[in-house]
Structures are given as C-alpha cells and as structure tokens.
Amino acid sequence: KLNTLTKDPDGRSRFILNLFVGYGADPSILIDAKPHVGTDRLVDGVRGIRCEIEALGGEIHFHTKFTYDPVRDKDRKIILAIGHSARDSYEELYAAGLHMEAKDFAMGFRVQHPQAMIDADLYGAVDAETRAALGPGAYKVTHTSAKNGRGVYSFCMCPGGYVVNSSSEPGRLCVNGMSYHARDGKNANAAIIVSIRKSDYDGAAHPLGGIALQRTLEERAYQLLGGRVPVQTYGDFKADRETTEETVGSIGPEIRGQYGYSRLNDIFRFPADSPYASLNEFNETFIEGMESFEHKLHGFAREDALLCGVEARTSSPVRIPRGEDFCSNIPGLYPCGEGAGYAGGI
C-alpha cells in the first residue's frame, strides 16, 4: 500500500510509483486512489531494484550488522535510513551521542473479519460481477475516546489479507498484516490501535523509553503461547476470558505462521505502582473504539471477530531531530525514513 501521498509538491511519490511500475508493479497504481503493489509483487520488484543498484556500482550487504564509530566515521556522509525496529542501532547511536527524543505512537491488535462482510457493508447488495469489478473492500475508521481523549483507529488495512508474525527479537512477538496482489484471502484484517502517549512510558526520562515498553508487551505476547501468535475472539476479550478451540466462532484465522487460541487482556494490564499503570485504560478504550466502529460497519464488533497480538510497531517511538539541512547533531549523519520518526504509516 502506498497511500500517504500528501504534502508532496516536488513529486517524490510519483517518482516512487513510476519506479515500482518499472520493476513489475501493476500500472494501475499510477491512477488508483489507494495504490497497492502486493507482497508477492514487491519481492520481485525489490530484487530488481537491488540488482540495478549493484549494476550501478553499489553494494548490498546481507547478514551484516551496522555499526557506527564516531572516530572512524567522522568524515563520512551517511544517510541513516534504518527502520523503526532497528533497536540495536538506536542504542548504539544514542551511546555515540546522536540526539534522540521520545514521541507518541500507537499499539493494539490485528483484527480479522470475513472479507465478504466488509464488502457487503461497503457495497451493499451487488451481483458477483459488480463485486469483482469493485475489488475487495477497504475501510478506514477512527474514534476519539470521550473518557480519556485517546485515539482509536484502523491502520494498515489489508483486504483479502493475512496476519503475519513479524517478530525480530528472541523471546518477543509482534504481528503485522499483508495482502498479496490478488487480495483474494477469505478475511480482511487491520490493526486497531490506541494512541500511546510519551507520558505513558515516561518518555521525558529517556528517549528510548518507548522501545522498552514495546519490548515488555512483545515479551508478554510471546509468553502466552511460546512464540505462536495468540488469537482471541472479540467477545471473549470483552468478557476477559480465554478463547479455546471449543469457543471460537465461525471465522477461521488467516495467519501466516503458527498460532493458537489464548487471552490477550493482560498484555496491556499493569500493577498500580508500575510506570506503565496509565495503560490500564487501554482495554476499555479499545472496546469503546470497536463498539463505535460497529455504527459505521455492521458486524465490526461481532462476537467472533478475531484479535491477534500484539501489534506494537505501527510507527517509530523515537524521533531523531535534524536541522534545516536535514543533518542530525552529528555532522555528516542524515537520518530519514521511519526510523528517524519523520515518515511513517502506509
């Protein structure tokens, strides 16, 4: 998905779309309101881009750890385009003196519904030919809690898609979503996430405090089933009870990787004296958002909707400040992209 095409007077996004088409993406992305490449097409496209970089004299290093040495690298010009999950790089660069600051972000669960239900909500009663012409339906929903002001919203909605285990550290688990180009899976999924404030994890005390919180939640998710993706029905989440093979509803999970049924309620639950105690309002806020979305999409809050968790990495919890010349406080080091906290989302 390449949806964020706003605030782009210089045509950078158009350049990227044309580049993807040149490496195998469907030309329809040049005119679609919500252009979508597809994970399967993207793999081939990135491979072609990599080969072109190498043909032009560039080097690609796999299975290689990035390190920064203030003495060794002081005269280099480095574009730092790390992703928001490059936690070891954040830690090393912070120790080297790179200025960083905590920021607000959002976390939650990946929620699955039947794609046919979403299509019926969006298109109404249409014949099969019309439905095929329209393609799998996509939604975007938002809600602001009247109780605490937190936002609840959908993120990275994947029509006809799959939930994937996107963990990158031992003993921790996080999920994401994806769609193949055809978007022909049985389920629709999206992250339904709740805003996380810097004050929730004492971001003023340490700029990497958000990463520490992410790790805590991912460890809890991992421990539920020993690394398998934990799944719970929305009805059981509301009732604060475990989902089992016997109690799961009619929606079959569409998950790439191993999964099992469990109970997600305690992932965001903390003792009253915990520095994360303010997150005890997460579950109630999540439910409030789901019930609000029911008024926009009938069946969204159905009892057998499936929650998978935890979705902890929707955006970077860190920003690397930079000047008008885009340079950081370290001369020659230019942070950009999601890992720098300036570009994020879909």
Where are these regions (language model features)?
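Residues forming the flavin
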Residues: 1, 6-266, 270, 274, ...
